[in-house]
A protein has these predicted regions:
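A short, glycine- and basic residue-enriched loop/turn
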Residues: 13, 40-41, 106
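Conserved short beta-strand elements that form part of the metal-binding/catalytic scaffold
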Residues: 33-66, 116-122
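Conserved active-site tyrosine of GNAT-family acetyltransferases
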Residues: 22-27, 82, 114
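N-terminal beta-strand motif that seeds the catalytic metal site of vicinal oxygen chelate
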Residues: 1-20, 66-68, 121-125
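Vicinal oxygen chelate
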Residues: 1-5, 85-125
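Short secondary-structure junctions
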Residues: 31-36, 89-93
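Mid-chain, well-packed structural core segment of small domains
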Residues: 71-87, 91
Length: 125
């Protein structure tokens, strides 16, 4: 039996234009725990997954970003709380899928560096 080459996702990197502005957004608005930062990077802990904000080393890395789906318990309450912290949302919380008695809700937002991310919540219907 072949074992998996990839064991797990250990870190997600997000390119930023202004590290201090991004650091404030992820720490103060999203409430992530800052592990440490340098002049060009900041590392956060998010329930066992490390999130790295980085000033791109090369121009070709400046635009590459993935959507990060942040799981929350109550998407509507979290949405309202983050609106109060002036987080810019692209839409409102909405159902994207229903599997049996479980609904998957999402709402997309922009960080201060123009990266798109989302809140995700699975709710018993």
């Amino acid at each position: 039996m072949e074992t998996n080459i990839i064991q797990k996702i250990g870190q997600i990197g997000v390119p930023v234009k202004d590290l201090n502005r991004a650091l404030d957004f992820y720490k103060e608005k999203l409430g992530l725990s800052l592990l440490f930062n340098t002049n060009s990077m900041a590392f956060f802990e998010c329930n066992g997954l490390r999130l790295m904000l980085t000033l791109p080393e090369k121009e070709e890395f400046a635009l590459s970003s993935s959507v990060i789906y942040f799981e929350v318990n109550n998407i509507k309450d979290t949405y309202e709380r983050l609106l109060g912290k002036e987080v810019t949302f692209i839409d409102e919380p909405h159902v994207v899928a229903k599997m049996g008695q479980t609904e998957t809700w999402m709402v997309f937002f922009k960080d201060t560096e123009d990266n798109t991310h989302a809140l995700l919540s699975e709710v018993e219907a």
